Amino acid sequence: MGGAGTDWLSVGVFAAFTAGVLVLSAMLGRRTSSAGGYFAAHGQVGWFVNGIAFAGDYLSAASFLGICGLIAFWGYDGFLYSIGYLAGWIVALLVVAEPVRRLGKYTFADALNARFRSRAVTVAAAVSTLVVSLFYLVPQMVGAGALIKPLLGLPHWAGVALVGVVVTAIVATAGMVSTTWVQFIKGALLVGLCTLLVGLILGRGFEVRDPGPPRDAPARDVGSVTALPAWAVPGGEPGPDGMVRTEGARTGPLGPVEFLRVFSASEVAAWRTSKVPAPDGTQRSVAAPERIQGNDLLLPGNSPTFRGLRSGSPLDRVDFVSLMVALFLGTASLPHILIRYYTVPDVRSARLSTVAGIGAIGTFYVLTLYLGLGAMTGGRLDTGDSNMAAPLLARGFGSVLFALISSVAFFTVLGTVSGLVLAGSGAVARDLAAAALGRLPEERMQVRVARIAALVLGAGAMALGLLCRDLNASFLVGWAFNVAASANLPALLMALFWRRATGAGVAAAIVAGLVSSLGWVLLSKDAFEKVYGLPAADALAPFSQPAIVTIPFGAAVGVAVSFLRPRSAQEHPGDGAGHPAGERAG
């Protein structure tokens, strides 16, 4: 930390945010004794509030911390995630928003099972909701742990535990009512503060700075220092160590387009990490600067994830396409996003709230490009933790902005985790409980079970956050989108738009997509290398992102089972346009 004053300021801002969230939840908790209040905020949330809450729910730790970090270290590759995340809202707007609001009530399974009244569909959808929510929870908890040390000086595990405790309090006390307002406030603050930070980046422009005293060696231990690791060079000659120094050269304020033009024409020193043998026989992580042309960093293919785009390997290219497919189709398959449609009063509000959400989310993702490049060329980077790029960039503009950005980043984690825990607890309290009992529990019992489930999910999220602390948040979310799109999208489209779909077919599509995508991810090269610590060559899956295979596989299984298994007596065909039989849009 920069000093005692900065420490206390950060602590004070953080404490104010956290206290405000807890007080809000306690006040709103009195209005959520019914299932309608707890799971859907009584269906009376305005479309604009819901739209900004969509942004607060969707713009997770991966969006803010992970993408900014990827851009800060690898350039345009990180922005590819932004493009994929935003494009997915087109599917949400054009395909699922209206029918999900029309058919569902409280959970993802409600909309999926409106036609079939099938226990198999209910159980499959509930299990899928829990698995996807847990997968998505991991990067949020990783982001929380990364933030807590520079913000409060506490260890990683303390950040994970703090998020778990606060989120459990939010969800257990007031459910969707408090979650909606936490997400609305978070979405507005995140977009507003990031806009301010980008304005400061553009106002500063580029400056060639002295990177510090000469180094005795070209590499330093990862994470041992938080240094000024990269700087743009509008001109100049290399010095003895190969670095260009024209100390004090400035561009002055730049517009958004001019900023990218100057960056493209400059040479940038970016840090790269690698592992080297240590004297004791272990592997030691070190970081060293590498000179790269700015225009090269504005092209894809620099990061390990997307390097295959330049390798010419067909499998590497398929891996990239598969990730983009998952990001594009995954948004409309995320249960914690879909249940937000139940909070608005009608179909028109569902559509308008999606448009408002797209506006806020699109604005934010454009800002991430400038945040990441600003961190690369003028901020502070922790070479051992890319997730800290945005908060450390803010520190360069003063302790107040650092405290605000870091607290909002932590608030970002709270908003997303609240939605995920609420989706999972609803699946347990309504769907699994109904399947076990053969009927829905009475409303007060549903709320009671949901609150207990929130406690269990919060504990599970904390455990997973500790196990996966060293992985990049956006990387982990890519896996979550693969699993969500594979398990949920084929089943959702079948249930909403295919007259011949049966309950058995929809349940089979969920199971096939879920099992195949999970199995593929766990057997992939990335899992072997980054999770298990094993050689990537030992992996059984040919590439890491499974959506391009597992989405069609789940759909094929669902279609085949629908043809092979006749419709049961309680099922009805629907009209193939997202309406139950006999119902039309008004």
What name fits each language-model region?
Residues M1-G586:
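Membrane-embedded helix-loop-helix hairpins and adjacent transmembrane boundary segments
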